[in-house]
Each structure stands twice: as structure tokens, then as C-alpha cells.
Amino acid sequence: GYIGNTHNKAKINKLKAGTAYVIKITALNSSGIAISSRTVGCTTLYSKVKIKSSYASTGRYTFNMQTVNPSNSITGYKVVYQSSAAHKLITKYFNTRYSFTIPISGNTFYQVKIYPYLVLGNKRYVSSTSTDRYISNVITLQKAGNTNSSMSVKWNRTAGADNYSIYIKYPGSSSFKKVKTTTSNFFTLTGMKKNTKYGIKVIANKKMKNKVWHSDSKAYNMSLV
């Protein structure tokens, strides 16, 4: 395309997000004859980004972002998050394209909004479209008693959770099976055999619109001696 301009700057509209362009700038004299020319590359900001993977660790949560092409269409990420316990918005800027970590505390869901941004000159341009996630740390289980054939566990409630799913790995099985979804923070596994290990993990669930979000999980072993 061609843009006629007598000023020292021009605005090009209707470009695609996250796309590299080559722009040729030509200076013309009063007769319309080219007297100099320069070609420059530019890129537009991605409107939205994707998360490659994410995980919780002690006191923090890490997001690994999917690589964009061209990579220089993103400088970093603006991250806005709040916990279901405090309801206080926190905003952080991360000058990285690949991975970032936010601090979190246990026993609460967090709403996380991730916006890509691009720095041109001294100005930061932030996308108006966010990638949204609801995250929560792992649930820590505590033994709450046992009989000759059963064992009970309990856990602290997670702020913002609607319910909890209990998964058991029975002896001889290589995978966990969901056995119950409950609003309680207490569970008893019955029919246990002595000197036999059972796997258990509890996951907090939060429903938002048509999607259910889950906390991270940690597997524990249970056994009756």
C-alpha cells in the first residue's frame, strides 16, 4: 500500500495482530521524485497469548508461556491477580516472553489475568484482551483417625472453592480413580487392608461460567499397620 504524507510520522491501520511487516519509507522532492529511501521492519502486538504449562510450588505459581512468532511482537506480560480470600487486585509487569512466577499463599483460589505488552521507544503498549486462569495451591492432607479397616483425613478449606474431589489409587492399580465429590473437608476411606498402601489426593474445584477450574494436586500414601 501507499500512504502520502507531508509530516514526519504516519499511522497505518487495519494491520493484523502479532504480525511482522516490512515498511519502505521514501522521501520525495516537490516534483515527486524519490531522493532517499529506507526500509524498516516492524511488528504488531499480539492481542492474546497462550499458556504452555503452569505449576504450583511452595509460596509461588509459575506460568510457562507459549512462544510467539515473531518473538519481538511481545516484550513481556502485565499480570493482574487477586485471591478469593483478600479480593485485592495486584498488578505486576514481567519483562520476559517465556516464563514468570507470582507469589501465592495456600488455601485460596486466585483469578489471574495475563495481558501481553510491547515496548516501543519509551512507551508500553498493553493488549486489552486477557488470558484468564483460576489457580490454587495443592491441598495438604492431615490424618484424622483410623480403625482396623479405615482411615480418615482432613484438610483446610480453600477460599473460593465450590467443592472437593477425592481420588484413590487402590493396590494393584497404576492410576487414581475419583471416588467422591464433596463440600466437606473430611473423608474416610473404608475397606482398607492392613500393611497395604493406598494413594489419595484431594483437588479443590471452582466453577466459573461453563468451565471448572482445579487446584494443583499432591498424592499421599495411606496405610494401616
For the regions a protein language model found, what residue spans apply to each?
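Conserved aromatic anchor
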Residues: 59-72, 149-160
